[in-house]
């Protein structure tokens, strides 16, 4: 989702446009609008559902740039079940406690849509909010039966044996839906139109860089940092 941001930083696209960018990791996507509102962030990457909920709730946020897109070929996020849980399909999630990195955020909303499409009432699943770094420990400790997670956290969980991928449910989602958007306060964009434009242009250049197969190793290295 944020690969273009990492690449733009690593390849110097921000610096080329005289942007000083400090990347901050926000464990729960649902807290990004509040961080923008308090000026802890100038630009943040909420999921579309989190952004819309924030605007509907009265926050004066605007979009600066797009982000990642869904694809049936992407297996970078999915349902990761605790070892020994027996979860194999949507029906097995009924009555289970499942951690999601932000209630109402993209992974939570799309997972519920997948359950619905599979004939499962999401209200029969107990969802709890859990940040990505917590996922492995929550599975090991048995606090949750599964998590809706994403790489690199998902890969670390499976490699450690704490859990297994029960479904790459993202492969069932429609193509080319936004997974995250880059947003800012309207006031900040009005005062800094050049910076907002330079940020967007940097991501466009990074996206073009990522589309070239010869750059795959550099892209993976940038994301890994």
Model-derived features: positions:
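Short, glycine-/small- and polar/acidic-enriched structural segments
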Residues: 1-131, 138, 145-152, 162, ...
């Amino acid at each position: 989702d944020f690969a273009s941001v990492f690449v733009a930083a690593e390849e110097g696209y921000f610096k080329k446009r005289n942007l000083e960018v400090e990347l901050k990791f926000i464990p729960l996507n649902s807290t990004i609008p509040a961080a923008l509102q308090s000026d802890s962030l100038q630009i943040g990457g909420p999921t579309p559902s989190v952004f819309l909920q924030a605007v509907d709730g009265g926050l004066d946020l605007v979009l600066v740039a797009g982000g990642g897109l869904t694809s049936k070929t992407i297996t970078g996020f999915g349902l990761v079940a605790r070892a020994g849980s027996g979860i194999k399909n949507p029906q097995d999630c009924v009555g289970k406690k499942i951690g999601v990195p932000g209630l109402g955020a993209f992974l939570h909303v799309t997972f519920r849509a997948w359950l619905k499409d599979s004939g499962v009432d999401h209200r029969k699943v107990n969802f709890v909010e859990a940040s990505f770094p917590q996922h492995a420990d929550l599975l090991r400790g048995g606090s949750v039966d599964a998590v809706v997670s994403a790489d690199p956290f998902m890969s670390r969980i499976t490699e450690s044996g704490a859990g297994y991928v029960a479904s790459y449910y993202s492969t069932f989602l429609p193509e080319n839906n936004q997974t995250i958007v880059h947003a800012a306060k309207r006031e900040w964009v009005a005062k800094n139109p050049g910076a907002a434009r330079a940020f967007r242009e940097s991501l466009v250049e990074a996206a073009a860089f990522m589309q070239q197969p010869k750059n795959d190793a550099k892209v993976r290295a940038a994301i890994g940092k």
